[in-house]
């Protein structure tokens, strides 16, 4: 390949290719496939493929841990269930449009082939690179691979936004604190990014492509955390009385008083109403309230978080795990209590849903949604359940119903300016606090009156 010859020549005559930020003089193409782009990248970036293959972004799994049954486990997007589009397995080609690889269309994907790594999805600086929404991670056919490869450099906010701002199928669907409004936020929306010019990588960059930050897979293992205190220290305030809260209250609790402040976020998804031919007007924010493929939705803006004690860990519902359908199923359960000194009162987005389950086996159904035989094409829940459960190697009784579920999503972004943070009276006042339910948190009343965990 012409490009390979150019790069090899550069290496032989001592040009510092790796340190060279402008790649345009080394990249020539043409490229018959995106894998050829990766092959070219690895000619100089030797060993990077081995690093990437150890990451959560590549494997969609967190660290190994031992569960309450004494079993070793690794969990992540590969095997966790949510109450949005439910499950990866049998729906690969749609879900893996956000994978940092090429061609993960079924369970035969080769995680050991370095040429399957997509360097461009994170390092494109042309602004023109995009994945095909249903192409199993392959680039959209319109992408000019040579142009994009010549542009590569350090990651940008858009690098992260393309996937993380659009989780669940669109901006604000999954994350209430990560939406399109965060691409160029005002200081009022996010002080660090809007006022100080922070990028995602300023906080999240780790070593060897190990991006910092605990998603659901990391929460299960209790690893890969980062904290405001990493930069601000244990006594970030001038007043001691406020610093006394740091050991029991997460920084985000006061400094992110609400989320989805400029763009709404989805808070309810009812799969049981899907399949109907009806027209429902858009809501006050211009968001859909109904989709035949997916059912009814509810969107909210300027949302007050739900607060729970959290110690950095969480238990998650596992495929095939039985539950009581008379109660709302919690798909993840943030760990921590008032009596656990590693726990802090922490803000979450609560996502509520009504999703499909097997009433005879009393566990969730993982339906096939995408593809010619998926529910989004056939509108046949029974067939979609049969196919999806077979792929997941779980028994399907032939009966289905719908159950209420809840899922907690940590709130870490949209840090407001200090003047907009919560004040003492927002939580402690003569009247009953409308923000914090002290009894639900384990207190007998307002801890300012009855005592708490402050130093």
Q: Which residues does each predicted region cover?
A:
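Terminal low-complexity/disordered tails
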Residues: 416-418, 425-434
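Sequence context of c-type cytochrome heme-c attachment sites
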Residues: 19-156, 162-225, 229-243, 345-352, ...
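Repeat-solenoid scaffold signature
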Residues: 224-332
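Positively charged n-region of N-terminal signal peptides that target proteins for export
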Residues: 1-5
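Long, compositionally biased charged/polar accessory segments in the mid-to-C-terminal portions
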Residues: 289-334, 338-346, 351-355, 367-389, ...
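Bacterial N-terminal signal peptides
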Residues: 6-14
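Short, well-structured alpha-helical interface segments that form or flank functional binding sites
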Residues: 246-249, 343, 419-422
């Amino acid at each position: 390949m012409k490009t390979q010859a150019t790069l090899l020549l550069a290496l032989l005559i001592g040009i510092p290719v790796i340190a060279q930020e402008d790649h345009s003089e080394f990249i020539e193409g043409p490229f018959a496939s995106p894998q050829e782009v990766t092959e070219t990248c690895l000619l100089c970036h030797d060993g990077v493929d081995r690093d990437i293959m150890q990451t959560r972004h590549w494997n969609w799994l967190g660290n190994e841990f031992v569960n309450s049954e004494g079993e070793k486990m690794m969990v992540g997007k590969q095997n966790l269930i949510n109450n949005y589009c439910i499950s990866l397995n049998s729906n690969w080609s749609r879900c893996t449009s956000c994978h940092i690889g090429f061609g993960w269309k079924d369970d035969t994907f080769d995680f050991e082939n370095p040429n399957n790594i997509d360097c461009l999805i994170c390092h494109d600086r042309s602004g023109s690179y995009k994945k095909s929404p249903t192409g199993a991670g392959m680039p959209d056919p319109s992408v000019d691979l040579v142009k994009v490869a010549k542009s590569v450099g350090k990651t940008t906010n858009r690098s992260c936004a393309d996937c993380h701002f659009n989780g669940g199928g669109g901006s604000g669907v999954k994350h209430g604190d990560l939406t399109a409004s965060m691409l160029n936020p005002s200081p009022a929306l996010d002080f660090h990014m809007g006022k100080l010019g922070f990028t995602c990588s300023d906080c999240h960059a780790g070593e060897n492509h190990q991006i910092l930050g605990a998603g659901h897979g990391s929460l299960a293992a209790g690893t890969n955390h980062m904290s405001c205190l990493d930069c601000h220290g244990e006594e970030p305030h001038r007043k001691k009385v406020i610093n006394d809260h740091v050991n029991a209250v997460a920084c985000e609790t006061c400094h992110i008083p609400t989320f989805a402040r400029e763009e709404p976020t989805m808070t309810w998804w009812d799969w049981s109403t899907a399949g109907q031919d009806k027209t429902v007007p858009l809501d006050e924010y211009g968001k859909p309230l109904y989709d035949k493929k997916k059912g009814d939705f509810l969107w909210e803006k300027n949302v007050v978080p739900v607060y729970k004690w959290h110690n950095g860990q969480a238990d998650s519902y596992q495929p095939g795990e039985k539950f009581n359908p008379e109660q709302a199923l919690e798909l993840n359960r943030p760990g921590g209590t008032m009596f656990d000194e590693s726990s802090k009162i922490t803000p979450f987005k609560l996502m509520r849903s009504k999703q499909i389950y097997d009433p005879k086996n009393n566990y969730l159904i993982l339906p096939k949604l995408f593809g010619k035989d998926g529910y989004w094409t056939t509108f046949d829940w029974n067939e979609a359940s049969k196919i999806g459960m077979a792929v997941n190697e779980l028994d399907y009784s032939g009966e289905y119903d719908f159950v209420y579920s809840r899922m907690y999503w940590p709130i870490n972004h949209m840090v407001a300016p200090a003047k907009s943070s919560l004040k003492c009276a927002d939580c402690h006042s003569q009247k009953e606090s409308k923000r914090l339910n002290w009894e639900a948190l384990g207190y007998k009343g307002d801890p300012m009156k009855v005592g708490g965990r402050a130093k």
